[in-house]
Amino acid sequence: GKLPMSRVWGMGTSASSDGQFFPTARHGEVMNMVNAKYGSVPGLKAYTHVSDQFAPFACQSIPATVSEAPYILDGLLMNEVGRHVREQYADTAGFTDHLFGASSLLGYNLVLRIRDLPSKRLYVFNPDTTPRELRKLVGGKAREDLIVANWPDIFRCAATMTAGKIRPSQLLRKLASYPRQNNLAVALREVGRIERTLFIIEWILDTDMQRRAQIGLNKGEAHHALKNALRIGRQ
């Protein structure tokens, strides 16, 4: 990204990430590495981050059976290239409100191509003031009091991830496993609900954002195609 000509493709401030399935040997069946989405062949996924300059800067080997969403932030925090990214694109159905909350706290604008977008509900601070036309889209009230009460702990979580003391994927999985009454988990979820609501509204209104996301995801697909072409025997 330091060569002047690299700016022809982008400024290095946006990136996309996606998983690519690779078949493994027979022992993969014993390790339960089979995902029905890819048929009966066992394998792993290489979850790769590619910058807007077509440069891959992070790659993680993850089980084919897990959701990709928790690993988005892991790749961004792996090195300085990812830390300079401001807008991150991903095509995933496994997102969580915790992911939206953590992404915002770490300074990333998360742009996901969400499946079944019309079915997603919005969260507002005062449902009574919501325009009548939008009330059917509102899923509930954002719990501002819970966010304020737990803000120091939320901030410490963000600092812990930034300092590399814990990987974001580990923290997100841990929070997801907590009982619903865990205040920190619920508070970060509330932050995520607010961020997701803002994103959905912006996505619907901003066609330029949709275009940027499509271009970014296409660059990731081009990188996948190159790896497929270079694989020996496509294996």
Spans of features found by a protein language model:
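Short, basic/hydrophobic alpha-helical segments
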Residues: 67-87
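A short acidic (Asp/Glu
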Residues: 25-29, 71, 96-105, 121-126
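Acidic, metal-coordinating catalytic cores used for nucleic-acid/nucleotide bond scission
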Residues: 88-98, 116-121
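Helix-centered, glycine/charged polyanion-binding patches within enzymatic domains
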Residues: 107-145
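Secondary-structure transition/capping motifs at alpha-helix termini
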Residues: 6, 50-54, 78-84, 106-109
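Active-site cores of enzymes that catalyze phosphoryl transfer or operate on phosphate-rich substrates
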Residues: 2-68
